[in-house]
């Protein structure tokens, strides 16, 4: 009787799941430490790079109208007036946002009136200024009202200047609402308090950047 000897292949050692998880965790920790060290050594480079990655901007170009949305009276009507003087647009639309209690009492100027006065002082005639919408409450309702104006008036291109950090959200919202009905351009404008290369030195810049990141995510999820 012949004895049979069974041979087996050497067992292949596989890393345990726990070991692999530990390696991934350590790699992530190492990356975070290195990134933190780099940011500590060169914080301005990192912060400036973050702004460059976030900010999107269209070049101003001839358009049927320029729209001035709610807020940002320190820079939005100024940009619109500049485009008008350069002959890029002959019509400036002003968002008709809802009046605040103080505005209803006549203590404060309405958004439409305040922007209209700024535009006229910058050389834009009253005949070139037109309000759009009614009691608009946020960027999305402004985009919808602006789209309705464009369709009603046969507009093919509209420029909507906004600040550097809000440009990404506004650009996405306009493209989402307008579709292929008209071209929307969103030039990113520096607010008077900060620019892309020094935003972290100003409280409004810090708050503005973080708020816009959250708003952008909210808009993408909601709309």
Model-inferred region functions:
Residues 1-10:
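N-terminal intrinsically disordered, acidic low-complexity segments at the extreme N-terminus
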Residues 9-56:
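N-terminal type II signal-anchor transmembrane helix
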Residues 12, 42-201:
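A structural signal for short, hydrophobic/glycine-enriched beta-strand patches
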Residues 33-35, 49, 194-195, 211-214:
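Alpha-helical structural elements
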Residues 202-223:
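A transmembrane-helix-recognition feature enriched in membrane-embedded lipid enzymes
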């Amino acid at each position: 009787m012949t004895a049979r000897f069974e041979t087996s292949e050497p067992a292949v050692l596989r890393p345990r799941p726990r070991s692999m998880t530990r390696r991934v965790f350590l790699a992530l920790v190492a990356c975070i430490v290195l990134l933190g060290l780099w940011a500590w050594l060169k914080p301005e480079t990192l912060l400036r790079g973050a702004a460059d990655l976030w900010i999107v901007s269209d070049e101003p170009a001839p358009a049927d109208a320029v729209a001035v949305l709610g807020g940002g009276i320190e820079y939005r009507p100024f940009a619109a007036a500049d485009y008008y003087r350069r002959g890029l647009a002959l019509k400036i639309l002003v968002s008709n946002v809802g009046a605040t209690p103080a505005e209803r009492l006549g203590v404060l100027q309405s958004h439409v009136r305040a922007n209209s006065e700024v535009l006229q002082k910058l050389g834009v005639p009253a005949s070139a200024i037109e309000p759009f919408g009614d009691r608009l409450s946020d960027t999305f309702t402004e985009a919808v009202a602006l789209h309705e104006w464009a369709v009603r008036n046969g507009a093919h291109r509209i420029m909507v200047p906004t600040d550097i950090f809000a440009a990404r959200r506004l650009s996405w919202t306009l493209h989402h609402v307008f579709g292929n009905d008209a071209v929307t351009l969103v030039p990113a404008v520096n607010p008077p308090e900060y620019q892309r290369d020094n935003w972290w030195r100003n409280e409004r810049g810090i708050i503005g950047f973080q708020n816009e990141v959250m708003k952008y995510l909210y808009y993408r999820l909601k709309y």
